[in-house]
Amino acid sequence: MEPKLMFKPTEKQYTALQQAFDYYNEKLFKDSLPQVMLTLNRERNTFGYYVPSIWTDDNGVEQWGEIALNPDYILKDGERTDKEVYATLVHEMCHLWQEYDGSAPRRCYHNKDFAEKMERVGLITSSDGTPNGKRTGQRVTHYIVEGGPFDMAFQAMPDELLIPCHTLFALKGESKKKIKKARPKSVTYFCPKCGATVKGKEGTNILCGDCMEKMLVKTGRDR
């Protein structure tokens, strides 16, 4: 009798994240980005962050930055999809790009150079996740351009690169917010033309009655 193969969650999770980083590096950055240390970190009030040159090898010769994703927003039955989590990964990869090829500002600030790079990869910077938000600033998130480079790259991404492990509840402060399995996902949609917003079930096709435009999913904040 052959021994049962044990599922190794750490290996599965970080292998998928590394492969996703390499995939988007190739598809959106032409393999121009250096490697980083990918981590999961429950930094408060943020989906993810990038820190430059914070890791080194035993000899102190090589240095790497860190990209962290917040597991409190990688929930099994939460509002954020794998697509939105990987949009955060690409957001932080744009910070990495700016560190080496752009005009890097002070940490966590999103300047015009950053906003333009984000747009080129198919993400629009916004202070509130809608077209009405400010494109630059200290606290800026983004929304996904439908049919843009990131959207198309995600659709073509192999299934094995999807996130294999999701958290069952969020650890925010000292409380544990249990997620009910039967609860339908509710997200905020916005009109890319007029900025009107509406709540609805995830996956619903909603048209703006004023503009007759398909409404897009609004995302939260990144650093």
Region locations from a protein language model:
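Active-site recognition of the HExxH zinc-binding catalytic motif
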Residues: 87-100
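Metalloprotease/metallohydrolase-associated module, dominated by Zn2+-dependent proteases
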Residues: 4-80, 100-223
